Amino acid sequence: MSSNGSRQPNRLSGGLVDRRRPMDFTFNGNRFQGYQGDTVASALVANGVKLVGRSFKYHRPRGILTAGSEEPNALLTIGRDAYAEPNTRATVAELYEGLTAKSQNHRGPLGFDVMAANDFLSPFLSAGFYYKTFMWPRAFWEKVYEPLIRSSAGLGALSGQPDPSKYDKGFLHCDVLVIGAGPAGLMAAKTAALSGARVILADEDFRLGGRLNSETYEIDGKPGQTWAQEIVHELSEMDNVRVMPRTTVYGAYDHGIYGALERVGDHLPPNGDKPRQVLWRIYSKRAILCAGAIERPIAFGDNDRPGIMLASAVRSYVNRWGAAPGKRVAIFTTNDDGWRTAADLAARGIEIAAVIDPRKGDAPQKPHGAQVFMGDAVAGTYGRKGITQISLASGRDIPVDCLAVSGGWSPNLQLTCHQRGRPAWREDIAAFVPDQGIPPGMSVAGAANGGLSLQSALTEGLNKANTALQDLGFKTSPQAAPKSDDESTAVTPFFYVKESTSRAWVDQQNDVTVKDVKLAHQEGFRSVEHLKRYTTLGMATDQGKTANVVGLAIMAEQRGISIPEAGTTIFRPPYTPVPIGALAGRARGKDFRPYRLTPSHAWAEEQGATFVEVGMWMRAQYFPKPGDKSWRETVDREVSTTRNSVGICDVTTLGKIDIQGRDAAEFLNRVYINGFAKLAVGKTRYGMMLREDGIAMDDGTTARLGETHYVMTTTTANAGPVFRHLEFCRQCLWPDLDVHLISTTDGWAQFAVAGPNSRKLLQKVVDPETDLSNEGFPFMACSEITVCGGTPGRLFRISFSGELAYEIAVPARYGDALIRALMKAGEEFGVTAYGTEALGVMRIEKGHAAGAELPGTTTAQDLGMGGMVSKKKDCIGNTLSERPELNREDGLRLVGFRPVDRGQQLKAGWHFLPKGAPADMTHDEGWMTSVAFSPSLGHSIGLGFIKRGGERMGEIVRAVSPATNVDIEVEIVSPHFIDPEGERLRV
């Protein structure tokens, strides 16, 4: 073994790193050096670092196990301060100049973790201990046990600072998506690209080629690494191909949509100006999964010591990165592929201490100078912070500083399960392969499909691409797959060493042992799903990529059945962890929940309005004027001015839905409780819609502007939910109806003009072609109009205040100009602008229901609108609204309340009790929903629900708030405090 500098004692010559670009980095405060093209893991291996972390439960020493994204042990925090990223796999994190990394999940130094005391408590922390321990004494649950468990939970820690990195999102479309750029993926991508199809080739690695980068294969007489880079270069030069390295396709969703995470900046020093990662939504017509396979470990005594690695990972570090995991290496393999590790190490001058193969018979090859033990197994290991010796089942001890383990290969089939697909067991390769339920449009090639030889991968990639092209109508390729080394893939199922006397680890991150699996069987948790949750097998950040099959095999043996009979769990997205920042993209802070501003917002700011958040809207709450001593005085003035003269309020936030089509009237008839089939053109009608369970969903008005044209308004809070509900009805319930919907909430500015002088004010703004007289434009009329000399608009004569009122609408871009024109026209009448507070006061005075009266539990009967329910037609929720429990004679009814002592103030949330009854649930008769001080009446008023409310007008009951020690008498009255006959709004 030759070293390439004293700073990297385990660095070999060769490899695919750029030695012209050395890079300094730190690990746990110690300075090291690597090269461009290294991962953090390969650089640590080159520097002789074996101990990199601690396990989750027992805090046992952990080293690097793999060389890819399946890594369960080497989880580090990369970066510092706000840029720190916990739980980063060292095996995929690219090295860059100045990188800082630190180990995690330990207290005290990594080499002396005080939490390692948990290992001595392992008899009390076995599988399912959390169901059986900490049960007594009860007082300790929250005071002792929970704080103890929570302080011990987790792996890496967040910085506690806002993430300064930028993330982005994007959409891509292609004919063929190739997932994985190994030999099968490169062959599939090239075949598809030559046909003229639009191709996306995505791979999680920064160097495309898959296992070819780590092996000594030849393809068409040239090194596999060279062949791969030639194909990548050829694809990169083609206009119809997008090559995406550093891109993990993490999820397969409906309709050929795939989620992908591209790490565009993780290999560079932190830079807050450029995106760190991009989340892609890829729309593909066909997808070919060429994700390769993952090597499995073998469970044997103390198989978790640092320095024990997968055989393929050892080859990767030696061949790709020129880093030696050890100086004296033993290989423990159950298959022919593992023997190739011995050959590659020997070729690089690394001493082979022994090759151990549990299979009987002759050795597949004779590594130079190595001892061979056929029919034997590694039963145990020694070493504190790294392996120093192995013990064979035959009793022989062999000193080593690295052990390469190969228990066979498991195809990377996770994406095939994301739509409930279930794999099948193949006995010849002792692995699960894709079978039923593969996402539509997906095919699988290469090792991911069980084709473990290089030649089969190349051939399958070509064939699956041709099949996809044929399905899409493209010309298929007549070329044959290139010729390659044809290696043996013979394997004998062998999952754990029964002769081991010490703990044998199955899931190294979550500290699940063979004994834990057997204990789960003993205690009745034998289903694969129960096994997973009882032992936490496969529930770590790696989702059991290296552990699941071993655990399932042990459970199958315990049950006395075969592995396919035992079954397997399936996978769900994401394939590897996706940062929450990437899912959010640019939607952070106010970009996540931006304020929606009304068209009159700038004008309202000029008037000194106080604003309030109403959902995502910023609405003017009230408009204080010089001399106003309090907000109440301002609101009282706005209400009084409106009722005595005229007031204007921006009601743009009300949901507006444009409904058109030949069957629009029938559609409305089916969603509203009252009839809309005979609504005349130029008329507006109040309506209420129910949920399917008969509960009131929303109320509002719908105006008929033309024979097939309607405009619906909804409450501000329910604008989105109602639109989604209507779209569901249109698309799923009645797709045969000719009706089309579009939300126009943001497209129209709308203002309520209310008060006795509202008609006079509008006559100065609305163009004279529109007759605004009571006869020409009566209550509930609507019309398309023009204003201010030809600007198109709409006018509705509806009232939320109980006064003569209109709502005038113009395209949103004219909203600011319209509010200024309205206020200018109203100066001679002493017009006032009013906000949401005055709006709320007037609606309570008039008895209109709003959000507080529509909490999702009330019915039309409760709201006093039972008479609106049409008996001549059906509608959504009609049948269930007739349930006896919803129509009880003693049910809740909406009524008004006023204090017997007019000087007392009411508050929402108070409960009603009969006079003389104790304040308990048994005697509770209802609650107060909305309250306001009425300047028109001079005292506090409220709306609320009380049992048999309609029959109890004038009755005195108690309004009680035990939380604030309030107990006063209130009188039940009509909810219509102002103009109960509705005369004002019809003048």
Regions found by a protein language model. Name each.
Residues V550, E557-L690, I695:
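Acidic, proline/glycine-enriched N-terminal capping motif
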Residues S2-L597, G747:
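Residues forming the flavin
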Residues F27, I78, L392-S394, V614, ...:
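Structural motif
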Residues N30-F32, W280-I282, R396-I398, D698, ...:
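Short beta-strand segments
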Residues A677-F728:
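Well-ordered mid-protein domain cores that form the structural environment of catalytic cofactors
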Residues A293, I438, F525, D636-T652, ...:
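Residues forming anionic-ligand binding surfaces in small-molecule and nucleic-acid pockets
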